[in-house]
Amino acid sequence: MPLRSEEGPYFGDFGGRFVPESLVAALDELSAAWEAAKADPAFHVQLDELHRSYTGRPSIVTEVPRFAEHGGGARLLLKREDLNHTGSHKINNVLGQAILTKRIGKTRVIAETGAGQHGVAIATAAALFGLSCTIYMGEVDTERQALNVARMRLLGAEVVAVKTGSRTLKDAINDAMRDWVTNVETTNYIFGTVAGPHPFPTMVRDLQRIIGEEAREQVLALTGRLPDAVAACVGGGSNAMGIFHAFLDDENVRLVGFEAGGEGADTPRHAATITKGRPGVLHGARSLLLQDEDGQTIESHSISAGLDYPGVGPEHAWLAAIGRAEYRPVSDAEAMEALRLLSRTEGIIPAIESAHALAGALDLGRELGPEGVVLVSLSGRGDKDMETAGRYFGLIEEGAVQS
C-alpha cells in the first residue's frame, strides 16, 4: 500500500486516541466534520481561494547558491513558507480548521502555541471569521516571544501565560486540553501540529500537504528532476509532514528531519525526541517521548520555542520505525550559525526553528556533493526571534531602546 494513503488513527504502533471520556464526542464530531469537508467541493473551493487571496499561495521556491557554497556546493532550494501571511506554515492548517469550526457551529477557538506562530495564525483566522479566541502559551515562551504575544493581543486574542510545569509548549497543551473539556459545547480546539489524538495528526498533515505538493512541481520545473533529499525541522512535525508527504512514495528521495539537539543530544538539555525518545502516551496519542526511567515525561530544551517539545507526531515516529525517514539532532549553536549564515549570504532571516533544517541541509549538501539537490522547508521567518538572536550574537547595545 502506498505510504501516502495512510490515514490513521494508527500509524504502525503509533497514534490512536487516549483522552478523557468528556472529549470523545468532540473528537468524533471533529472527525465526522473533517470527513464531510474533504468530500465537499465547496470546502476546497473556499480554502483554495483563501490561500490564493489571503495566505499568498503558492509560496515560491528560492535557490540559495551563496549559502550552498558552505554545504559542499549541492543545490539548496528553499520552500518559502516564511513568506505566507503571518510569517510561517501555520496559516495553512489554521484556515482549514477555522472553516471547520464554522461548519460545526462553534463560536470560540482555543489553541496552544510555542513560538507564537501558531497562536498568531489562530488569532488572525479568528479575527477573519469573527470567532472568540484564547491562546495558551508557556510563560517561558511568552518572555522569549514577546513580539508574537503583542501580535496575538492586537488581533483580539486572549493570551494566557501558563505558569505550571516547565512553562513551555507541553504545559500550554495541557491547559488548552483542560479548557476544551470544560467548554466543549461552544469551543473548538485548533491543534497546531501533527500530534495529539486522532483526527489531529491526519487532519493537520492533510492541511499542510500543500507545501510538498507545490514544492514537488516547483523543483521538477526548476531542476528537471526530484530532489535527492528533503529537509525540515521537527518539533511536533507539521511543516515536515507537510513537505515530506508528497515524496513518501519516491524511494530515491531521502526524507530527513532535524530535531532540536539543544546543548547536545547526549546532555539532559535537548528536544531530540526521535533520536533519544521511547514509546509512550502524551497529549492523547502514542508516540516517541522524552521520559525518565519511571515513564514520566521529562523537560525538553531548545533555544527555539517551537521545537521545545518532548514528543513528536505519531506519523514521524512510524516513518522513523520503518526506515522511510531519518531524524538527526542539530544543536542550538549549529542552528544559530545557520541563521546568521543565511542572513549574511542571501538576505533572508529565518526562524530559529527553520535554521535547524538549514544547518542540517548544509550537512546533507556535503554528503551529496556538487551534483546533489536538497529541498528545504523554510517554515518561518525570523522576525519573532530578533531579541533571542540579538542577545545570542551581541547585536543589541545594553540599554538600547527596542521597538
UniProtKB/Swiss-Prot annotation:
InterPro entries: Trp_synth_b_CS, Trp_synth_beta, Trp_synth_beta/beta-like, TrpB-like_PALP, TrpB-like_PALP_sf. It catalyses: (1S,2R)-1-C-(indol-3-yl)glycerol 3-phosphate + L-serine = D-glyceraldehyde 3-phosphate + L-tryptophan + H2O. Gene3D superfamilies: 3.40.50.1100. Its cofactor is pyridoxal 5'-phosphate. Its EC number is 4.2.1.20. Pathway: Amino-acid biosynthesis; L-tryptophan biosynthesis; L-tryptophan from chorismate: step 5/5. GO terms for cellular component: cytoplasm. The modification N6-(pyridoxal phosphate)lysine is found at K90. Keywords: Amino-acid biosynthesis, Aromatic amino acid biosynthesis, Lyase, Pyridoxal phosphate, Tryptophan biosynthesis. GO terms for molecular function: tryptophan synthase activity. The keyword Amino-acid biosynthesis applies. Belongs to the TrpB family. The beta subunit is responsible for the synthesis of L-tryptophan from indole and L-serine. This is Tryptophan synthase beta chain. The gene is trpB.
